[in-house]
């Protein structure tokens, strides 16, 4: 019974970032994305939910790997801060349409992600490396966000 509870907890840990991302996306209207001017090399709208789903799952897996033996409070706090910043970006960009503020928010997310990766690396190198696609995607998002600022 104890192992069953642990397995359920581990599954929740892995999928929690994905669920959070889905819930935060329900708060906004993505139709705005279709009407704003976007920079060159902007991915098609359909790419975003696919990419974010993969990245959120990798985030959950990293968190699980780093905490599977014991909970590391630094990793936990870094993860929570990062996800709060991440989820709030969606609201700031799409709902509030505050593109400059959302770009600043992205810089904070990138810095938070670097801190998260450093904390993960101390505990589990694989967990840290799983976050590099997330970091790269955040840099792409910053490029897109700045492009939206310039073009709109």
Model region roles, listed by residue range:
Residues 2-6, 65-75, 120-129:
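Membrane-interface helix-boundary motifs at transmembrane edges
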Residues 9-21, 81-84:
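Alpha-helical transmembrane segments
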Residues 17-32:
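Alpha-helical transmembrane segments of multi-pass membrane proteins
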Residues 29-42, 151:
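Membrane-interface helix termini and inter-helical loops of multi-pass transporters
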Residues 52-63, 82-85, 109:
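Core segments of transmembrane alpha-helices
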Residues 91-101, 148-152:
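Membrane-interface helix caps and helix-loop-helix hairpins in membrane proteins
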Residues 126-152:
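Terminal transmembrane helical module of multi-pass membrane proteins
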């Amino acid at each position: 019974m104890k192992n069953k509870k642990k397995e359920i907890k581990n599954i929740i840990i892995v999928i929690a970032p994905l669920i959070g991302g889905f819930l935060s996306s329900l708060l906004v209207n993505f139709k705005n994305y279709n009407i704003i001017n976007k920079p060159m090399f902007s991915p098609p709208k359909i790419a975003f939910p696919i990419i974010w789903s993969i990245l959120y799952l990798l985030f959950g897996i990293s968190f699980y790997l780093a905490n599977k033996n014991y909970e590391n409070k630094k990793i936990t706090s870094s993860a929570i801060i990062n996800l709060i910043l991440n989820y709030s970006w969606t609201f700031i960009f799409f709902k509030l349409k505050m593109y400059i503020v959302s770009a600043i928010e992205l810089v904070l997310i990138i810095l938070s992600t670097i801190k998260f990766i450093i904390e993960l690396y101390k505990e589990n190198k694989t967990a840290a490396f799983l976050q590099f696609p997330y970091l790269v995607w955040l840099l792409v998002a910053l490029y897109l966000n700045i492009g939206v600022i310039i073009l709109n």
